[in-house]
C-alpha cells in the first residue's frame, strides 16, 4: 500500500522537472528568437551598408563624371582660346616717334652734353682725336661720346649736281661727359680744340631739348632708312638743302647767250632744281624781269 504522503512528495518533484523543462524550452526558444533577431538585424545592417556603399559609389561616379565633363569643357575652352590666339595675332605696340625715342634714349645716358669750338674743317679730326685720348689717358669713365652732327645737301657747281654730307654745325663738336678738372683738361688740350662754348672754365651743359634738336635730323633719317630696309623698299627721298656754289642772290652777272646776250643782270632768285635764275635786265632804261639758265650767264 502506497503512502499517500510519498505520492504527494513525488508529484511536486515531477512538477518541478516539468517546470524546469518548460523554462529551458522557453529559454531555448528565446535564444533562438534572439539569434534569429540578431541575424535579421545583421542582414538589415548588411543590406543598409550595401545600399550606402552603392550610394557612395554612385555619388563618386557622378562626381567623377562631372569632373570629367568640366575638364572636357575647360579643354575645349582652352583650345578655342588657342585657336583665337592663332587666328588673331597680338596687336603690336605702335613704334615710338623717332624724336621721342631719341629723347628717351638721351634721358638715361650718363653725363651731360657740352659744345666745344674747333678750327674750321677740323670737326671730324677733333672727334677722332678726343675718342683716342679718352682711352689712352684713362678717362673713359668721364668722357663718353663725341658727335659731329651732319646733314645731306645737294651742291651744284659748274652745272654739275652732287649730293654730299656736310657738318651741320661747322666749327663745333658735341661732347657727352662728366665735367671734372681731369676731363676738362683732356678735352681742352685736344689738338684742334679752341675751347668750350660758354664759360671757358665752367661751361654750361646743353638742355635735353637743345641736344634733341641738334641730333633729331640724323635720328629721323636713320629710322626712315631702317623702316624701308625692313620692308624691302628703297630709302625714302628726303627734302635736302640745295646749294648753288656758282651763284648767289644779289650777284651781278653777264648774259652770254640768248636774246639778252651782253646785257648785265642782277640775280634775285635761284631755282637749283631747274638750274635757272630769275634776275633783272635793263632794257631801254627800264629793269625787266627775266629767267635765265645757268649756262646763259657768267658771274662778273
Swiss-Prot record:
CDD domains the UniProt entry points to = KOW_NusG (cd06091), NGN_Bact_1 (cd09891)
User: What Pfam families does UniProt report for this protein, alphabetically?
Assistant: NusG
**Which InterPro entries does the UniProt entry name for this protein?**
KOW, NGN, NGN-like_dom, NGN_dom_sf, NusG-like, Rib_uL2_dom2, Transcrpt_antiterm_NusG, Transcrpt_antiterm_NusG_bac_CS
Name the SMART domains for this protein.
Answer: KOW, NGN
Q: Which cellular component appears as one GO term in the record?
A: cytosol
Q: Provide one Gene Ontology biological process annotation.
A: transcription elongation-coupled chromatin remodeling
Q: Which PROSITE patterns match?
A: NUSG
Where composition is biased (Acidic residues), the residues are 14-41, 47-97
Q: Which family does it belong to?
A: Belongs to the NusG family.
Q: What does this protein do?
A: Participates in transcription elongation, termination and antitermination.
- What protein does this entry describe? Transcription termination/antitermination protein NusG
Upper classification of the organism: Bacteria, Bacillati, Actinomycetota, Actinomycetes, Kitasatosporales
Encoding gene (name): nusG
